[in-house]
Amino acid sequence: MIQKHAIPILEFDDNPQAVIMPNHEGLDLHLPKKCVFAFLGEEIDRYAREVGADCVGEFVSATKTYPVYVINYKGEEICLAQAPVGSAPAAQFMDWLIGYGVEQIISTGTCGVLADIEENAFLVPVRALRDEGASYHYVAASRYMEMQPEAIVAIEHVLEARGIPYEEVMTWTTDGFYRETAEKVAYRKEEGCAVVEMECSALAAVAQLRGVLWGELLFTADSLADLDQYDSRDWGSEAFEKALELCLEIASQF
């Protein structure tokens, strides 16, 4: 039933059925339950070539076609796909993957730091502030999305087993990369946000509506900790390969 509001983004219809469903094309595509859906640039395609992954399908958008791979990892099939940046395209692609069989998803990608955290450090978001648009089409308006405890446990188990230090954080998910004003950054820091990225709350909302497991492993890139001197650093490039390796292991633990 639709909840009407003067502000359109705050309107919500809790009916999970839509005029266009993610599997409306009726493709002959049956994906594994486990999936790594990662914001890792060319690392996904590079790894797929390295291990001889099967390209079993494609997600076609107006600007880019995304290969969907299946690999064998420790004796079980895992779906592997590069996630597009931004809440709306990432939510659409993940919803499509779910429509074709994915049920347990781990994502990873970079985040900007609002606190003094070194580059290439691994973080586990446990709550996301919803300053993006896509989540409001999947879950009724609220200030935060809480991450699923089962996913958090699986992520942290793998990190601890490998002796990798991490922190649990609250993240600020925003659509406005160029609208992270000094006053807004300070406000988010006061609220407890340690990092900022562009998809977490949206993907958590997709998972909640569709009844699937989803979690995310973040790693640090640029820094907004000093409001007078933004530092892009090296965009967390040293952690890409390690992040993918960790996500494959996390997926196997689901």
Where does each model-flagged region fall?
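Accessory terminal and edge-of-domain segments that mediate assembly/interaction
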Residues: 1-106, 112-254
